Structure formats: structure tokens, C-alpha cells
Amino acid sequence: MHVKRAATAGFCMGVGLALKKLDRELDNNAKDIATLGPIIHNPQVLRRYEQKGVRCYTDPAEARSGQRVVIRAHGIPEETESALAAAGVDLVDATCPKVKRAQLGIARQREKGRTLLLFGEHDHPEVQGLLSYAGEGAVVFGSLEELQNGPLEDDRHYFLAAQTTQDKHAFTSVIEWVRRRFGDHVPVLDTICDATRERQDEAIAIARSVDVMVVVGGFASGNTRRLAEVAQAQGVPTYHVETPDQLPLDAIRGYGAAGLTAGASTPKSIIDETQKLLESL
């Protein structure tokens, strides 16, 4: 089988920086390292760090004074970070710079008295962190339809932002509707990162030129799920797998050309293995 592999597949800048910071702590022989939540959304990578002794705390209360704790790439709520610092926890901030920029941009709009409309996944850790910078009244929505049916008030001064890994085309539709509803003066923060845009555009282009698409990455990874969604929207059969052994070989064996892309937290080794398996069909 011929395979068209996306040039943008694999670790993004934010993931790479976060893992470098965690690796640096391990290289410095720190004995008591933990992350606050999964540092990235890839179970194979997380398993590797667990084998090196890195613990993953789901509850901030697990962190102890003096302990080295790495903040996940998705960021954490502002009040959680402040409480941990006040408790004497030695924090290493591995928040993606694009997420940090979104957090600070939202905080500046809050100071101007504006209310956030956030396009994102309600339960995603990045979204929970962004909301903590927004103040009261923020509205989270996962689709334009949800926003249209949401609790919007005519006398509020809104601004728009998106989870950094959201679908840029869907966000454009949201912007257009909000400005028709509330006026062109509604501020829009440019929070969808360049890597997300580039990956989605390349996934769309490849999907339009192949018989089947394979997207590799963690099932909990929002950006990976979005890649699968935009590829499938082109009308091509699309399979989202975490590892090559999850590929439905009987279902894809008869196709002539396969497209291959991967989420921002997918290691190159797994992408390589998937490509090799596809090419053997």
C-alpha cells in the first residue's frame, strides 16, 4: 500500500518543550518527581515516564511541600498553581507557551470587564485552566449550535477565544455568528495555535487524495480527535488508533493509498511503526 505521511505528524513545540523539562529533572537526578495530571495525552509516553519513577497526581493535594512537581503541558487552573506555590511545592511550569499566552490574554480581557465565550471541550484540562483566568459568567461550548442555544445576555460585553487545539474552520463559523449577533466590536483572541492549523490543513489535503486515512494518537488527545474529525469530514474512511496493532487490517487491506497523520503528542517511533505496517499491506 502506498502511504502519504503528513510532514506535520508528531510532537509539536509545546509537547517537545514539556518533555524536555521533565527529562531535565530526571537528568538532574531528582528523586521525587511528579506531574500534576498527565504531562501529555499519550499513554505510551506516560508509561515510559512511570517506569522511570515519575508519579502522576490527579489531586493537587497529593503534592507535598518541597516536592518537585511539573505542571502539565495543558496548564492548570490559576488558583491551583497559587495554592501549590503557597504550600511550598517546588513547581516546574511545563505549560505550552501557546496555552500560557491564551491564559494571559483571557486574564487581560477579564480585567477590561468582558465575559469569555470559550470554544472548547468542557472537561478538557486546558479548558479548565483557561476558565480560571476568565472570571465569572464564562460560557464554554463545544459547537456553534450549543452556543446558539446557550445562556447569552444582550447586556454583557463578550469576547471570544478557543481551546488551542480546536478546529479552526469551526471557530471561523463561530466568529461570524457571534459578530452578527453582538456586533463586529466583539474581540476575538487568536488562540488556536499555528501547529494545530497546519496539521488540520495538511490532514484535509491528504484525505482528499487517498482512499483511507489513519490518525495515530491518544484517544484522550483533543488535537488527535480533531484530526480524525476533519479527515473524516472529507468523506474518506478514517481510523483513529493509538498503536499500529489496533489497525483493522482486514478493513483497510484492499485500499490503494493511505494517508497517515498523528497528534501532537504521538512519538515518532509509533508513527514509523504504523507507516511500516501500512506499507506492508
Swiss-Prot record:
Q: Name one Pfam family in it.
A: LYTB
Protein name in the entry:
4-hydroxy-3-methylbut-2-enyl diphosphate reductase
The source organism is Oleidesulfovibrio alaskensis (strain ATCC BAA-1058 / DSM 17464 / G20) (Desulfovibrio alaskensis)
Gene Ontology molecular function terms on file:
4 iron, 4 sulfur cluster binding; 4-hydroxy-3-methylbut-2-enyl diphosphate reductase activity; metal ion binding
Q: Which UniProt keywords apply?
A: 4Fe-4S, Iron, Iron-sulfur, Isoprene biosynthesis, Metal-binding, Oxidoreductase
Q: Which reaction does it catalyse?
A: isopentenyl diphosphate + 2 oxidized [2Fe-2S]-[ferredoxin] + H2O = (2E)-4-hydroxy-3-methylbut-2-enyl diphosphate + 2 reduced [2Fe-2S]-[ferredoxin] + 2 H(+); dimethylallyl diphosphate + 2 oxidized [2Fe-2S]-[ferredoxin] + H2O = (2E)-4-hydroxy-3-methylbut-2-enyl diphosphate + 2 reduced [2Fe-2S]-[ferredoxin] + 2 H(+)
Residues where dimethylallyl diphosphate binds: 41, 74, 124, 221, 223, 265
Which NCBIfam families did the record assign? ispH_lytB (TIGR00216)
UniProt family annotation: Belongs to the IspH family.
